[in-house]
From Swiss-Prot:
Active-site annotation: E204, E417
Family named by the database record: Belongs to the glycosyl hydrolase 1 family.
Reactions this protein catalyses: Hydrolysis of terminal, non-reducing beta-D-glucosyl residues with release of beta-D-glucose
Gene name in the database record: BGLU17
Keyword Hydrolase recorded: yes
GO molecular function term, any single one: beta-glucosidase activity
High-level lineage: Eukaryota, Viridiplantae, Streptophyta, Embryophyta, Tracheophyta
UniProt protein name: Beta-glucosidase 17
Gene3D superfamilies: Glycosidases (3.20.20.80)
Pfam family, one: Glyco_hydro_1
């Protein structure tokens, strides 16, 4: 009887929170049957995503030691838009049960999160000590998800290298990282693999290498002095070294999983790569070649090795001896090292050829000999959003999916991030801020584009909204809100479902969908 009473209370609380959203302004939800969950394959899964440093908080709690992001945000607060950090973030570490309840309320099939390496291995290695409290946290989270019918999709590395390894040998600039990474993931597979059936080795390795080691905007903040105001780094060599050791770490992880765990646990493993769709700025042969080159340098940089065992030919030609080489043994290990492609897509770019190229002040940015822009003749590439880098380009999403299908042997694809932000306008009341109608339109357009790609043969099997909750958005701090769930950073981190969460709830329950104007 007590269990039945608790169940009734839970149901009432869910209805109340959904009703609160209706009460705000029911006009935002115009229902139709134009796009529903039933439009997608039966086993297609829908979810939302997060990452450890961006959401967990509890930075110095229960044995966790600093990552490079803890150090970067303290050492270079001027590189964060609002000077903030992830010390507290959403306090997901303490409030995960509340957040899982919201996931269930929305109707998520799956939740993507990452594991904090330095919460499991505070010093980065087993020799430095295994933190049982960290293992316990992720066990509790995984169990809570599964008990609520939500499938975990776990990212092993989401940009948060243990600071101890950065101090000891330079982190991903050193081949030693491959051994230490495999040691770390082995613990994760052993501790969580009986319940986690899908793993992402590394999130957006291209963005980590470019932003962290070419322009220095994110941790660890390295670049050549002629690129940005960095005190250390080499933008002509370090991005390629870091990428190389990321790829080898990924491949060694997949090899370990396949040899030791996959047959027993029955799971799958892949890498997540972010890309723009590269559109020739003008209909000329030079622009068309430039767009292909831009894709090679951004997406193919990682997708080519894990599919074919080596970097794109264009990179070999243009980067020369600054691009590391795989040994025959490494190439064999790297080739085919995925069960699925993880794709993060947000927006598109126009691309044109750079006609004049100087052999001075070299960097990853100049090596591709292209110029990326967000406008052509004063017209933006898509509808603008509150973020000056993100324009709404759903047709580019379809093009990316079909490009992956045709160039990379039609792999299984999971769309592991797709989303758009609203600005964190502190002058707005919470009730007004909860109405994020533009975000609903964005997702409707992109889901329609995804369906079209599937109809043309792309093997897409999942879609994850970025993000579950408003969180710490790297170099932008708390400037933007991507979440389905509003986090009130001014009032005790209280959670409120946004209108986009209600739309997703209706979409996932197959009852209705948002009608676009």
């Amino acid at each position: 009887m007590a269990i039945k009473s608790i169940f009734i209370i839970i149901i009432i609380s869910i209805i109340t929170s959904i009703s609160e959203l209706y009460a705000l302004d029911p006009s935002f939800l115009r229902l139709s049957t134009s796009l529903q969950r039933s439009s997608f394959p039966q086993d297609f899964r829908f979810g939302a995503a997060s990452s450890a440093y961006q959401s967990e908080g509890a930075a110095n709690v229960d044995g966790r030691e600093p990552s490079i992001w803890d150090t970067f945000t303290k050492q270079y607060p001027e590189k964060i838009s609002d000077g903030s950090n992830g010390d507290v973030a959403d306090e997901f570490y303490y409030r995960f049960k509340e957040d899982v309840a919201h996931m269930k309320e929305i109707g998520l099939d799956s939740f993507r999160f990452s594991i904090s390496w330095s919460r499991i291995l505070p010093r980065g290695t087993v020799a430095g000590g295994v933190n049982q409290a960290g293992i316990n946290f992720y066990n509790h989270l995984i169990n809570e998800l599964i008990s609520n019918g939500i499938r975990p999709l776990v990212t092993l590395f989401h940009w948060d290298t243990p600071q101890a390894l950065e101090d000891e040998y330079g982190g991903f600039l050193n081949p030693q990282i491959v051994k230490d990474f495999v040691e770390y993931v082995d613990i994760c597979f052993k501790e969580f693999g009986d319940r986690v059936k899908e793993w992402i080795t590394i999130n957006e390795p291209n963005m980590f290498a470019v932003l962290g080691y070419n322009v220095g905007n994110i941790a660890p903040g390295r670049c050549s002095s002629y690129v940005q105001n960095c005190t250390v780094g080499n933008s002509a060599t370090e991005p390629y070294l870091v990428a190389h050791y990321l790829i080898l770490s990924h491949a060694a992880t997949v090899q370990l999983y396949r040899e030791k765990y996959q047959s027993f646990h029955g799971g799958t493993i892949g890498m997540t790569i972010q890309t723009y769709w590269m559109i020739p700025k003008y209909n000329t042969p030079a622009c068309r070649e430039a767009a292909k080159r831009a894709l090679d340098f951004f997406f193919g940089w990682f997708a080519d090795p894990i599919t074919y065992g080596d970097y794109p030919k264009t990179m070999r030609e243009l980067v020369g001896n600054r691009l590391p080489k795989f040994t025959k043994k490494q190439s064999k290990m790297v080739r085919g090292s995925f069960d699925f492609f993880g794709l993060n897509y947000y927006t598109s770019r126009y691309v044109e050829d750079v006609m004049f190229y100087a052999n001075t002040n070299l960097s990853y940015t100049t090596d591709s000999r292209v110029n990326q822009t967000t406008e052509k003749n004063g017209v933006p590439v898509g509808e603008p959003t509150s973020a000056d880098w993100l324009f709404i380009c759903p047709e580019g999403f379809q093009d990316v999916l079909l490009y992956i299908k045709s160039k990379f042997q039609n792999p299984v694809i999971l769309v592991t991030e797709n989303g758009m932000p609203s600005e964190n306008d502190k002058s707005l009341s919470v009730n007004i801020a909860l109405n994020d109608e533009a975000k609903i339109k964005y997702h409707q357009l992109h889901l329609t584009a995804l369906l079209e790609a599937v109809s043309q043969g792309a093997d897409v099997r999942g879609y994850y909204i970025w993000s579950l909750m408003d969180d710490f958005e790297w170099e932008f701090g708390y400037k933007y809100r991507y979440g389905l769930v509003y986090v009130d950073f001014q009032d005790g981190l209280k959670r409120h479902l946004k209108s986009s969460a209600l739309w997703y709830h209706h979409f996932l329950s197959n009852s209705s969908s948002y009608q676009m104007d």
